[in-house]
UniProtKB/Swiss-Prot annotation:
The name this protein goes by in its record: Dihydroorotate dehydrogenase B (NAD(+)), catalytic subunit
Quaternary structure annotation from Swiss-Prot or TrEMBL: Heterotetramer of 2 PyrK and 2 PyrD type B subunits.
Location of the active site: 132 (nucleophile)
Task of the protein: Catalyzes the conversion of dihydroorotate to orotate with NAD(+) as electron acceptor.
Co-factor binding comment: Binds 1 FMN per subunit.
Taxonomic lineage from the root: Bacteria, Pseudomonadati, Thermodesulfobacteriota, Desulfuromonadia, Geobacterales
Naturally occurring in which organism (per UniProt): Geobacter sulfurreducens (strain ATCC 51573 / DSM 12127 / PCA)
Annotated Gene3D superfamilies: Aldolase class I (3.20.20.70)
Database matches in SUPFAM superfamilies: FMN-linked oxidoreductases (SSF51395)
GO molecular function, one term: dihydroorotate dehydrogenase (NAD+) activity
Binding site for substrate: 47, 71-75, 129, 194-195
Gene responsible for this protein: pyrD
């Protein structure tokens, strides 16, 4: 039997395999290039980008938990100007599609970032982080209100011709309602889930461990929730879904594809093993070969319910 075909397509972009690196866990790609074969990865998703540099939250801002980790990094990043000057030159040398994750605090910030990124040919697509407060409307998080989510996706859609992926927050009552709002605003794909809000407490000090008090929970602990949400959303929308949440092995990734994901993102696993994304792709290939499956696309949405 020939080697299985691992290629998939997201919004017109062909990926050599379905495994992407999740934003915030792989820097801007260059940081991992000495340790990882970037061409073993389907796509690189950069650390979240904002208009101005962001210092992030005070420490401590990471804590291990049972089956995962909490992070309160605070979206620390270099800002769009330094990204263009210092990060893009390296991206020109990479043969793997680069997707830039970005965020804002107003519709205008989202639109301006989309316009700036639209001018960079090395950027294959954008991923919008909508888990941010809208400072002009009482601080409500864009990603927890369908109307706000629609507005921000629409603003980005009108500002760029690049494919637009929207990263959905799981901290909502109805993830499908959020997915519909983003699809109606002409998103090209949806990625989910972002982290779940959690906290950790130091019993002896009687204080939160994280300086920010709360943080985002990721890792294997969130996988069952992520699988359920991916399954719900994939059945509800006609655009591709990218699965995220506790993917540590090729088996995990293929489970997300059965639930309806066209591709997956690997996040927390990168902290444990910088080569996790490439390893997971290889494990997927091995499973397909061992089970006589010629094309990974046969797995997408093949869950029997």
């Amino acid at each position: 039997m020939q080697k299985p075909d691992l290629s998939v397509e997201i919004a017109g972009i062909t990926l050599r395999n379905p495994v992407m690196t999740a934003s915030g866990t792989f820097g801007y790609g260059e940081e991992f290039s000495e340790y990882v074969n970037l061409e073993a990865i389907g796509a690189i998703i950069t650390k979240g980008l904002s208009l101005k540099p962001k210092a992030g939250n005070p420490t401590p801002r990471i804590v291990e938990t049972t089956g995962g980790m909490l992070n309160a990094i605070g979206l620390q990043n270099v800002g769009i100007d330094a990204f263009v000057e210092k990060k893009v030159p390296f991206l020109r040398t990479v043969a793997t599609p680069v997707i830039v994750n970005f965020f804002g605090n107003t519709l205008e910030e989202y639109a301006e970032l989309a316009e700036r990124l639209d001018l960079i040919p090395e950027v294959a697509a954008v991923e919008i982080n909508i888990s941010c407060p809208n400072v002009k409307h009482g601080g409500i998080v864009f990603g927890t209100d369908p109307k706000a989510a629609y507005s921000v996706v629409k603003a980005v859609r009108e500002a760029t011709i690049k494919p637009v992926i929207v990263k959905l927050s799981p901290n909502v009552t109805d993830i499908v309602e959020m997915a519909w709002a983003c699809a109606d605003a002409e998103a090209d794909a949806l990625s989910l889930i972002n982290t779940l809000t959690g906290m950790a407490i130091d019993l002896d000090k009687r204080r939160p461990i994280l300086a920010n008090v709360t943080g985002g929970l990721s890792g294997p602990a969130v996988k069952p929730i992520a699988l359920r949400m991916v399954w719900q959303v994939a059945r509800a929308v006609k655009i591709p879904v990218i699965g995220i949440g506790g993917i540590m092995t090729g088996i995990d990734a293929l489970e997300f594809m059965l639930a309806g994901a066209t591709a997956v993102q690997v996040g927390t696993a990168n902290f444990l093993d910088p080569g996790a994304a490439g390893r997971i792709a290889a494990e997927m290939e091995r499973y397909l070969a061992d089970n006589g499956i010629a094309d990974v696309k046969e797995m997408i949405g093949a869950l029997e319910v």
